[in-house]
């Protein structure tokens, strides 16, 4: 086959969906550089104070600029960006660089640490901005295409591809128990610097925000579903605190086998507990909704709103989805007795 025939054959190949997806959304993906000024006291001074109680004056304080980098994407013509909270939280300076080379100062409008979401605003000053189209993460199925875009390790405009490996992977399973989010799992390569960048579907719509990886494995990355981000974006853009309900308990999952093992241990810290499937309350926060409702350490939650529960992550999700100042009916196993208690959720900011 001659070169002319080869060129003609190549020209007949259809443009693949990845190219189309990146052409559609890639220009709206940005690099975010951050700077944070920190003051550090010399280690020698701290050692003297710790060992001998010597408090030297004046303090030899060093000011150091910590730099960070991540990704984000523009969602409207006014310059609103979505990214991860851990990319921009506590930053003193935020610089946003577009794919076309334009550079803007960014202002952090709002941060929500519990979902690791943040909104950053740039001033387009009359310039046109590329906008990333947002998809519907509720329509995703395991096996759907997933395209990750961002700036891993400082390598701008990097594209990797995989599939949606799992839906609704709990934060606890990911290994970040302090978050209130169920993640999309993907095998599209995600690396440091990808954080805050978009995960796209085959049409180039944003279906997630790349957030985390498992350091001990390859091909396991996690993204916040875009529907979650859409539901919170208005709070963050306006600088409002995102409402997160809580009831105020510490808990562990309980099985009859685990309860029996506990009850056979004379040194058990929980005493005798019911040998049932449920969620064992290991502590109750003072002045919390749970305490006000009469919940106690050693109680076992076996149902919520007449639906059986046996996993603390499920209970946490129910509380989160219920909203603030709403009632939940908990069925409690306390010793040999079954009790119905009503708990009214409260805003987590009231926890102090």
Which functions belong to the PLM regions below?
Residues 1, 7-10, 20, 71, ...:
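C-terminal recognition in membrane/secretory proteostasis and scaffolding
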Residues 130-135, 184-191:
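Short pre-catalytic strand/loop immediately N-terminal to key active-site residues, enriched for Gly-Thr
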Residues 32-35, 77, 90, 109-111, ...:
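Residue-level recognition of beta-strand microenvironments
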Residues 73-74, 189-209:
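Catalytic nucleophile loop of clan PA
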Residues 151-178:
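Chymotrypsin/trypsin-fold serine protease catalytic domain
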Residues 2-81, 89-91, 102, 117, ...:
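Glycine-biased strand-turn-strand hairpin within the trypsin-fold
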Residues 12, 67-69, 74-157, 217, ...:
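Conserved active-site neighborhood of the chymotrypsin/trypsin-like protease fold
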């Amino acid at each position: 086959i001659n070169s002319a025939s080869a060129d003609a054959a190549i020209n007949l190949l259809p443009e693949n969906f990845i190219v189309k997806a990146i052409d559609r959304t890639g220009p709206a993906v940005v690099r975010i550089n951050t700077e944070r000024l920190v003051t550090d006291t010399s280690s020698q001074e701290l050692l003297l104070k710790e060992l001998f109680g010597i408090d030297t004056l004046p303090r030899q304080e060093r000011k150091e600029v910590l730099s960070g980098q991540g990704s984000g994407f523009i969602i409207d013509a006014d310059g609103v960006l979505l990214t991860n909270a851990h990319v921009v939280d506590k930053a003193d300076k935020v610089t946003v660089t577009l794919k076309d080379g334009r550079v803007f100062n960014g202002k952090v409008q709002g941060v929500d640490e519990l979902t690791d979401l943040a909104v950053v605003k740039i001033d387009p000053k009359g310039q046109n901005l590329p906008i990333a189209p947002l998809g519907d993460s509720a329509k995703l199925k395991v096996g759907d295409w997933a395209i990750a875009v961002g700036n891993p390790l400082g390598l701008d405009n990097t594209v990797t591809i995989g599939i949606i490996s799992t839906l609704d992977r709990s934060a606890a399973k990911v290994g970040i128990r302090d978050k209130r989010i169920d993640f999309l799992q993907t095998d599209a390569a995600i690396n440091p610097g990808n954080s805050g960048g978009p995960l796209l579907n085959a049409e180039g719509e944003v279906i997630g925000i790349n957030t985390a990886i498992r350091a001990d494995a390859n091909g396991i990355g996690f993204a916040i579903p875009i529907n979650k981000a859409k539901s919170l974006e208005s709070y963050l853009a306006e600088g409002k605190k995102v409402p997160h309900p809580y009831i105020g308990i510490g808990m562990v999952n309980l099985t009859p086998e685990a309860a029996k093992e506990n009850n056979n241990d004379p040194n058990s810290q929980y005493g005798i507990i019911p040998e049932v499937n449920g969620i064992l309350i290991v502590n109750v926060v003072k002045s919390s909704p749970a305490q006000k409702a009469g919940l106690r350490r050693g109680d076992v939650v076996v149902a919520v709103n007449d639906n059986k529960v046996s996993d603390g992550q499920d209970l946490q999700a129910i509380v989160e989805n219920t909203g603030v100042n709403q009632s939940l009916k908990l069925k409690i196993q306390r010793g040999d007795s079954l009790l119905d208690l009503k708990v009214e959720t409260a805003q987590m900011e009231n926890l102090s």
